[in-house]
A protein has these predicted regions:
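Secondary-structure capping and boundary motifs in well-ordered enzyme cores
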Residues: 2, 60-69
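Short, hydrophobic/amphipathic alpha-helical patches that form generic packing surfaces
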Residues: 66-78
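Conserved short "hinge" loops at termini or chain/domain junctions
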Residues: 1-59, 87, 101-134
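Short secondary-structure subsegments characteristic of cysteine-rich extracellular domains
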Residues: 90-100
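Short acidic, glycine/proline-enriched loop segments that cap or flank alpha-helices
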Residues: 56-63, 81
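Extended, low-complexity, turn-rich repeat/linker tracts enriched in Gly/Pro/Ser/Thr and Asp/Glu
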Residues: 17-18, 78-80
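Hydrophobic alpha-helical segments
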Residues: 31, 69-70, 83
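Short conserved catalytic/interaction loops centered on acidic-Pro-aromatic/His motifs
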Residues: 81-91
């Protein structure tokens, strides 16, 4: 989805089809804030912010692009003090975030760079070695 598509999706979620409630700048900033959240996942740390209407989210599989619009809708509702709606959309985003994170770790979701190569976190977590009972 392009940035323009994502903004349209946010406007649909927030029932702001005329663009009178939330500025395009705020919506775009919240979409980029969602991208910042996705950067917490090691394999997605190189996702770039969207600045032009034709920009597309790279690295993240296309079926998950809409989750940035879900996050943005949550922030818009929060800004408008519609806390129930804000929490509902944030819960949906966090569920999707966990699904993506787990899918990447389990290997069911593959992340590809611009060259078509799979991105994997090869760093092994720290552990304790048992040297007494071997």
């Amino acid at each position: 989805m392009t940035l323009s598509d994502l903004i349209t999706r946010v406007r649909s979620y927030t029932r702001d089809t005329t663009g009178t409630l939330f500025t395009a700048s705020d919506v775009k900033d919240f979409i980029n804030e969602a991208i910042d959240k996705l950067r917490q996942i090691k394999e997605l740390e190189n996702i770039k912010h969207l600045s032009n209407d034709s920009d597309v989210i790279v690295l993240l599989p296309s079926q998950y692009h809409y989750m940035t619009a879900v996050y943005s809708a949550s922030r818009c509702f929060s800004q408008d003090e519609q806390h129930y709606q804000a929490q509902t959309y944030m819960d949906e985003f966090m569920g999707l975030f966990s699904l993506v994170e787990l899918g990447i770790k389990e290997g069911t979701i593959s992340i590809y760079d611009e060259n078509g190569q799979i991105i994997r976190d090869t760093h092994e977590p720290d552990g304790v070695e048992n040297v007494y009972f071997t």
